[in-house]
Design a protein with these regions (language model features):
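GHKL (Bergerat-fold) ATPase N-terminal catalytic module, capturing the glycine-rich phosphate-binding loop
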Residues: 1-96, 100-101, 109, 116, ...
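GHKL/Bergerat-fold ATPase module in large chromosome/replication-associated machines
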Residues: 34, 52-75, 95-98, 105-301
Length: 301
């Protein structure tokens, strides 16, 4: 929707005005409030850019377009410019030692890792199609993310093939999963996700760190020790929760009340699923026992 000069001054310059120390002092008692703070993420652009420009025009009627320029120092300039349409263009002038971030494959891999399931569409270039034996760009935006991923949907809306397809998208080289558990709870904590029981290979270590942690569909990490019980870190899948503290040590994480509840909840859901298969489909349970026993034995230890 674009910004006015006053909004640029308020939202983009506020950290520069107050200084990093003042900013951190303001949020020292609520560190989680820093995450997602408007303007803070924007300033990380200077980690790779020697200069950043914002050319923006507000949606407000009669608004004047402006250009904000800064080289990463406390100094910046704001000037009036011409811009036909509303919205904002952010232009990064990449440092010489960060030119790798101009490579299409590098950008694509980073977007796929961190923005794959963002709730707003992210376009990277244009879609390509084959024409006369070669790939050519079309006029259609190449949207790289899925804004409504499987774990945000209700289980009643999904079929087995939907879960298997999602698993193949996450782990293209993996065998078909044994079964899965769809997590969806909003009280006393918020947690959604899908956990898959994989076919266990001979080297168990290679199977760890396959659970991806998200916060409101933003990728955080694939190291979930302390959140998921140790014996279940062999599982694959996705968990998404805004109630997991993201800026704390593992020891603090393990003492957090919400994390304890989430860990207990996941253990119970896995236990309930195994028990249901054992009671309702003993043949399937026995057929999959060689793959399942590692989880059960590890859990007993």
């Amino acid at each position: 929707i674009g910004l006015t000069a006053e909004e640029i001054d308020k939202y983009i310059n506020q950290i520069a005005f107050s200084g990093a120390n003042d900013f951190l002092e303001k949020y020292k008692d609520d560190a989680n409030a820093i995450i997602g703070h408007f303007g803070l993420g924007f300033y990380s652009a200077f980690m790779v850019a020697k200069k950043v420009e914002i050319i923006t025009k507000s949606h407000q009627e009669g608004a004047q377009a402006v250009k904000w320029t800064c080289d990463g120092s406390p100094e910046f300039t704001i000037e009036n410019v011409e811009k036909e349409s509303r919205g904002s263009d952010i232009i990064l002038y990449i440092d010489d030692d960060c030119k790798e971030f101009l490579e299409e494959t590098r950008i694509s891999s980073l977007l796929t890792k961190y923005c794959r399931f963002l709730p707003i569409p992210i376009a990277f270039g244009k879609k390509k199609e084959w024409k006369d034996g070669k790939q050519v760009e079309t006029n259609e935006d190449n949207v790289i993310n899925e804004t409504y991923p499987l774990w945000t949907r209700k289980p009643v809306e999904l079929k087995d093939e939907d879960y298997k397809k999602f698993y193949r998208e996450l782990y293209p080289m993996a065998d078909e999963p044994l079964f899965w558990i769809h997590l969806n709870v909003d009280y006393p904590f918020n947690l959604t996700g899908i956990l898959y029981f994989p076919k266990v290979k001979s080297n168990i270590e290679l199977q760890k760190n396959k659970i991806q942690l998200y916060c409101n569909q933003v990728y955080v990490t694939d190291s979930v020790e302390g959140i998921v019980p140790d014996f279940l870190t062999l599982l694959h899948g996705v968990i998404d929760s805004p109630d997991i503290p993201l800026n704390v040590s593992r020891s603090y994480l393990q003492s957090d009340s919400n994390v304890k509840k989430i860990s207990t909840y996941i253990s119970k859901k896995v236990s309930d699923r195994l028990q249901a298969i054992f009671k309702n489909d003993r043949k399937e349970f026995e057929e999959k026992w060689d793959d399942l026993k590692i989880f059960i034995n590890y859990g007993m230890l």
